[in-house]
Amino acid sequence: MSLNMFWFLPTHGDGHYLGTEEGSRPVDHGYLQQIAQAADRLGYTGVLIPTGRSCEDAWLVAASMIPVTQRLKFLVALRPSVTSPTVAARQAATLDRLSNGRALFNLVTGSDPQELAGDGVFLDHSERYEASAEFTQVWRRLLLGETVDFNGKHIHVRGAKLLFPPIQQPYPPLYFGGSSDVAQELAAEQVDLYLTWGEPPELVKEKIEQVRAKAAAHGRKIRFGIRLHVIVRETNGEAWQAAERLISHLDDETIAKAQAAFARTDSVGQQRMAALHNGKRDNLEISPNLWAGVGLVRGGAGTALVGDGPTVAARINEYAALGIDSFVLSGYPHLEEAYRVGELLFPHLDVAIPEIPQPQPLNPQGEAVANDFIPRNVAQS
């Protein structure tokens, strides 16, 4: 099975070390462009662009990278409760059309009550997933070309429609990650690829089996992906030294503050990440070559595969054997590590190198009439 290898655009900051200004670098458009172009040339399938108040806006960043890349896809967040499904469907179709079919979407429900309150969202965990399920139903139906009437608990639309369809049919693939039961049910029923953070293989296997069974109950099959950091070097010793350097400037106060912030979230996935290290520096290798040091201060994905190219490739293939075909990777700093992964790891894997998409012909049409229909449909109306 050929593997889809993704990289990451660090719109929330970058540097040589975690938890310190030392060794950091400015993250401007030029730097993000360098990373995107490196990923494009090295054969990554796409880049994940993060979302949240600590990040630059993912949609604007993705749009700005379209003209400077050729085949790279952009995995961009959909935010139920923050954006209406109708507006999100228009944005998604536009990004897909402008990029010639290079748009992918990642459903993000949110987990930090403080950040959500700042965005005007005052729903608890179960309510957010109810709203996300309704959002996704409407979003998908619009991209499928339907005129949608929907009267849900959280979302109400009447006569919603999309005049400009996406390039990818039936719609651009939808990714999603969540560890709670309600999250797995949403994934099983509505998404195309279920993402998990980098837990030990036995825990990942358990989650995949749960989601696969729930999807089968809906008569569906879905794909699987995993989000990991990578520290790859020419030797295993050099890789472990690099891992230790990454957290060499962390002090206990910074770790404690970070763990307190993570504790206020209601994310089951974040709780599972925190349980891998319990905020302590010792015993961070939680599974062969799987290191939890990143999660001491970084929310979300908090584990890294550490080793030389053949060793890390062997661990990736262990995850692939569980049914995972997509690996969303990152490393610090992201420009240099994009090259290291491409040069030291890719030769030991069966990497699916994306082709440069050919321009897709669009149906000619005049200006929309009365903001309601396009002229070529007048005779049919």
UniProtKB/Swiss-Prot annotation:
Entry keyword Lipid metabolism: no
Keyword Flavoprotein: yes
Substrates-to-products reaction catalysed: an alkanesulfonate + FMNH2 + O2 = an aldehyde + FMN + sulfite + H2O + 2 H(+)
Known EC number: 1.14.14.5
Gene Ontology biological process: alkanesulfonate catabolic process
Origin: domain of life: Bacteria
Entry keywords, A to Z: Flavoprotein, FMN, Monooxygenase, Oxidoreductase
GO molecular function: alkanesulfonate monooxygenase activity
Assembly, per entry: Homotetramer.
Family: Belongs to the SsuD family.
The protein's role, per its UniProt record: Catalyzes the desulfonation of aliphatic sulfonates.
NCBIfam families listed in its UniProt record: alk_sulf_monoox (TIGR03565), PRK00719.1 (NF001939)
Note, other: FMNH(2) which is absolutely required for this enzymatic reaction, is provided by SsuE.
Protein name: Alkanesulfonate monooxygenase
Encoding gene per record: ssuD
